[in-house]
Amino acid sequence: MNLSDLKRNAYMLRGSDAKRGYMRWWHSFQGICPTTQETRTFFVEYSILNPALGTSQPILGQHPYYKRHGLKPSYLCIKAGVFPEPGDSGLQLQAYYPLTSLQVAQDPFYMQFEDCVYSENRISGSIDISDEVARHRSLMTDAGSFIWDLEVHKAVACHTGYIANAFFTAVHALGSFWHGEGIRTFFRGTV
């Protein structure tokens, strides 16, 4: 089970998957405020949807204009925030970017759009959502800002075995494939 396979964690949306596929890299972690010692649980998610359909603007499938014109969604998305706790509603920020801003390297895997960076050993970026933007319900975001810069050490992987190998992925044997490269991960940095 604890078998690292970085190829399964890399960008894989090619061929028909690039027109009808998505990938996401989800991170959930706790941070401790150095002054108050309060512990909070944060999350950062990088996702890509239908990259072959991308244009110079993000196409949001839930937006009425795009629905009317029959356009399929295609975008990069950063979602970040803090989970709610008793007496605190938490925060979820989502920012969408065009596929034209994506830069990807495969070996080692590295992805960047705008100032948001993802690699096997570092995640960093920022989101700043104004009240005006947050009023658009189709964007599904709160208003606020969030900045993160974290070193990532993936200690335990969850290898899903042969059913998610290159052959079964290529022939679309399953509707989706999952690989947990860092089901136990240590983070160090600032939020």
Q: Locations of the language-model features?
A:
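Targeting-peptide/extracellular-domain and disordered-appendage signature
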Residues: 1-191
